Amino acid sequence: MPWDSQDTRRRLLEAAIMEFSAYGIAGARVDRIASAAKANKQAIYAYFGSKDALFAAAFEDRIRDFHASVLFDEYDLAEYGGRMFDKFEDAPETLRLVLWYQVERADGPPLEVILDSNEDKVRRIKAAQREGKVTRTYPAVALLGLARSTAMVWHTQIPELASRFPTDRRDRRDTVVRAIRQILDP
């Protein structure tokens, strides 16, 4: 079978996503990533340059996937929250990467893909507010943050509290959507 450099790069990226989501940047090991990808450790440096650059590529890959698969609707932020909840349920590694990014890269340079996406969403919410379709009780950026935080509420609690949460996914999703609706229509 001929060597496929794009396939190797993709395998490394997928292995990195799982490794970084499990261990964070500091705890991830390039030898485990290479082994999981069935690739040579040197391939990581050839394709990505460094472990930090590999994390950035893995994180950006998941963020782009998130943006492509979670439809944003400024007129229905509650359902947007529900779709975010669904994504975190279906791809928990995405949320874990976000959490590691917040912990280990809080002071790092901002990623353009996130800046651009946030700016677009805030702009669209502001327009919906001017149209009178979305509450002006909170600034647009706060509404976006509240929707995101509420969508993550079930996934970011300490185990002692999380163990008391409803186990039915539909119930948890419904709670997210209803809570965001109440924020939007107090």
Describe each PLM feature range.
Residues 78-112, 151-159:
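Helical hydrophobic small-molecule/effector-binding pocket
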Residues 22, 56-83, 118-121, 126:
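Amphipathic alpha-helical linker/stalk segments
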Residues 22-26, 91, 131:
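Short coil/turn segments at alpha/beta junctions that flank glycine-rich nucleotide-binding fingerprints
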Residues 1-7:
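N-terminal intrinsically disordered/low-complexity leader segments
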Residues 67, 71, 106-131, 141-145, ...:
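Amphipathic alpha-helical packing segments from all-alpha helical-bundle domains
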Residues 11, 15-53, 57:
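Helix-turn-helix
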Residues 11, 53, 79, 83, ...:
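Amphipathic alpha-helical interaction segments
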Residues 86-90, 119-131, 150-186:
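C-terminal peripheral helix-coil segments that are non-catalytic and often amphipathic
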